[in-house]
């Protein structure tokens, strides 16, 4: 029998060990399990073994020639019961032991053996007998509204190990890396020593450039520097982002279409909220000052800033002319005016900041001992007359006779007029004011009675001519009655003054300069001149901007 054949039997076997160095439990290629019956059979019948061996060799050669594989070894069983019970276990053990080698195991139930062949050619794949297969198991239906659809695909493989990808990664790392500021030598640029300890020859131009670069890099801590992602704006997509997302120039992103179903993003609505600080302001008379965008009685703690409402083209703002509204493809409704930015702001109600509004200043109440100026009295009379003219649209009264001239001033004992009479007192001015108000009331009552007595059918030209002189005479009589009869010495035109100075002329202006030094503005502040003009221009621009916002609202 060949040395590569292994015989297995459950009965007590005798083991023939070729090499003495093999440990217990270890199998070698030279170990052969032989039944005791086979030993006796070998001794008694050697010619039959040769015949069986030849027969087996011929059968093995036939199988190898047919399959094209070379035989490696065989496992033969003595009894059929042992073959049926141990066949699967032996096959699994052999396949696991020789999994890394190209070995195929075949069982032969007729000869009660398992053969191992080395694969020399690939086995042809078995062609399926059926042309097609019908799947009878139903699949879960997808919701097309929640699954985005893409019109473009990328067939290229994103290989992270390519040179371009490595270069882009390195650039991104370099951009994000922010090394700590280290002091370096202005002359050679080395960070290990300073300019004082530099051994290389001094280059003044290089030192000057390095110093300028160092000083320009320093910034004030309170200056609002530009953020890293400050250029990103919501609702606006840059060209690079559009190219990365695979959208063309006139194509709207999918998120803008989904907003038509989901509405305005709540996170950006929270961003537009402006909460009050809770600080109350009071004016001079003790009443609380309301803000420019609030009204009295409001108790809201927050409002919405209109300028922070984001515009999304295709959702709350009309898209550009070159954009195509592909709402049917995305299964969303078309653009609706009810979702526009203006209607959304209206839906917020009164909780909206409409910009700065200038309010009128509340006049403080005048003190009781304050003397009203004649200009104020005249202004109030003019306003009163204007109100009467606006209320009554009757024709004006005929011209009345001018009032009589005041009596000549009385002469003093010396026969000369005094240089100037004293001004009237406060009581006299109040009495004159009351008399003038009474005259106006009388004139208003006459006008109302005349309007009631007139009718478009009864009046004629003769009655008008008769009523005119009588009204003029009555007005003259009342004016003569109401004229003051208090005598006075002299009359001067102009604004009456209650008190006069005892000095006839003002002092010389040079006297005020004694002991006063000249003021030198911004003496200890270099490069600070011209700030007043800059502040004026800034306030002017702010004023114009506020007026523009008020006009827009």
Curated annotation (Swiss-Prot):
List residues modified as Phosphotyrosine.
356
Pro residues bias: where? 395-409
List modified residues, type Phosphoserine.
Answer: 59, 292, 347, 421, 423
Task: List, alphabetically, the InterPro entries matched.
Answer: NEXT_complex_subunit_ZCCHC8, PSP_pro-rich, Znf_CCHC
- Please note every region of biased composition (Polar residues): 444-456, 473-485
Please name the GO terms of the biological process aspect recorded for this protein, alphabetically. Answer: RNA processing
Where does each CCHC-type zinc finger lie? 183-200
One GO molecular-function annotation for this sequence? RNA binding
Segments of this protein annotated with the region Disordered: 388-492
Coiled-coil ranges per UniProt: none
What are the GO cellular component annotations? catalytic step 2 spliceosome; nucleoplasm
SMART domains to which the protein is assigned, alphabetical: PSP, ZnF_C2HC
Name its cellular compartments.
Answer: Nucleus, Nucleoplasm
What keywords tag this UniProt record?
Metal-binding, Nucleus, Phosphoprotein, Zinc, Zinc-finger
Please give the function described in this protein's UniProt entry: Scaffolding subunit of the trimeric nuclear exosome targeting (NEXT) complex, a complex that directs a subset of non-coding short-lived RNAs for exosomal degradation. The RNA exosome is fundamental for the degradation of RNA in eukaryotic nuclei. May be involved in pre-mRNA splicing.
State the family it belongs to.
Belongs to the ZCCHC8 family.
Spell out the protein name for this chain: Zinc finger CCHC domain-containing protein 8 homolog
Q: Which organism is it from?
A: Drosophila melanogaster
